[in-house]
C-alpha cells in the first residue's frame, strides 16, 4: 500500500485514460451472437420475449411492463434504441438466427472507467443455458478487453433473488444494499450492488471458458461440471 509524504496510506497509482464508449459491434461466440438491437431485424422475434405470451413473473422486477402486440413493441424498441445513455444488444441464437433476449450497457462513467450491464430481458430459452452464459461472457470480455473499463456493475432489486444468484454465479461480487434507493411500480426498492473488477477478470474469464467448452457437455447437452466447479 503506497504512503504519501504525510505518512497516510493512499490508493495504488492507476492509468487515468478514460473508458471507450460502446460501439455496438457484432460479437460472435460459439453459441450466440450479440449485435446492435434493430427494430427491422429483431422485433418479430422479440415479441415472444416482450409480448403477452411471455411469463408474467419475469416482469415483476423489470421497470417496464410487457407489451400487448407488435406495434407496442416497435414503439418500445425504438425508444430503447434512441436512448443516448444506454447501448442495447440483441442476443441471437447462432444456429437459428433468432433473437432470444436483450441487455444493455448503461450508467457509463468513462472518467472512472465504470460501466453497468442492465435491462437484462431473457426468454426462458436463454436462462440457465450455454447461450445465456456465453452472452454474458462475450459482453464482459468486450467491457474489459476492448473498452478498457476497470469496474463492471450489476444491480437488482434486493428481493430479486434469481438475479442476484445469476450475478454471483457469473463472477460478480456482492458489495452491499442501498436502502430505499428507488421508487418503481408504486413500491419501494432496496438495490443490491454487485461488481466485477479488472483484477477479477482473468480468473472469471478462465472459468467462463472452461464451462463453455464443448468438452464440458455430454451428448445430451448436460454439463459435466457446474460453473462454480470450473
Q: Whereabouts are the PLM-identified features?
A:
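Conserved catalytic-core motifs of GNAT/GCN5-like acyltransferases
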Residues: 173-187
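GNAT-family acyltransferases
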Residues: 1-129, 142, 146, 187-230
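Glycine-rich acyl-CoA binding loop
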Residues: 132
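Conserved GNAT acetyl-CoA-binding A-motif
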Residues: 145-155
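Conserved beta-strand-loop-alpha-helix junction that forms the acyl-donor binding cleft
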Residues: 154-163
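Conserved active-site tyrosine of GNAT-family acetyltransferases
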Residues: 166-167, 194
Amino acid at each position: 500500500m503506497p504512503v504519501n509524504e504525510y505518512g497516510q496510506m493512499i490508493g495504488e497509482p492507476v492509468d487515468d485514460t478514460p473508458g471507450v464508449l460502446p460501439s455496438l459491434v457484432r460479437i460472435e461466440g460459439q453459441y450466440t451472437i450479440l449485435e446492435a438491437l434493430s427494430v427491422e431485424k429483431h422485433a418479430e422475434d422479440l415479441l415472444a420475449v416482450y409480448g403477452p405470451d411471455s411469463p408474467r413473473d419475469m416482469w415483476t422486477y423489470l421497470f417496464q411492463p410487457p407489451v400487448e402486440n407488435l406495434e407496442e413493441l416497435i414503439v418500445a424498441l425504438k425508444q430503447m434504441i434512441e436512448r443516448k445513455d444506454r447501448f442495447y444488444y440483441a442476443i441471437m441464437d447462432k444456429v437459428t438466427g433468432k433473437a432470444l433476449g436483450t441487455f444493455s450497457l448503461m450508467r457509463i462513467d468513462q472518467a472512472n472507467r465504470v460501466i453497468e450491464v442492465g435491462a437484462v430481458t431473457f426468454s426462458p430459452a436463454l436462462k440457465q443455458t450455454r447461450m445465456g452464459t456465453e452472452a454474458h461472457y462475450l459482453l464482459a470480455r468486450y467491457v474489459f478487453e476492448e473498452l478498457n473499463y476497470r469496474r463492471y456493475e450489476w444491480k437488482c432489486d434486493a428481493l430479486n433473488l434469481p438475479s442476484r444468484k445469476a450475478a454471483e454465479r457469473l463472477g460478480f461480487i456482492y458489495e452491499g444494499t442501498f436502502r430505499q434507493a428507488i421508487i418503481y411500480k408504486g413500491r419501494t426498492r432496496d438495490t443490491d450492488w454487485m461488481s466485477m473488477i479488472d483484477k477479477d477478470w482473468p480468473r472469471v474469464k478462465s472459468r467462463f471458458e472452461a464451462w463453455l467448452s464443448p468438452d464440458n457437455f455430454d451428448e445430451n447437452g448436460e454439463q459435466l461440471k457446474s460453473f462454480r466447479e470450473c
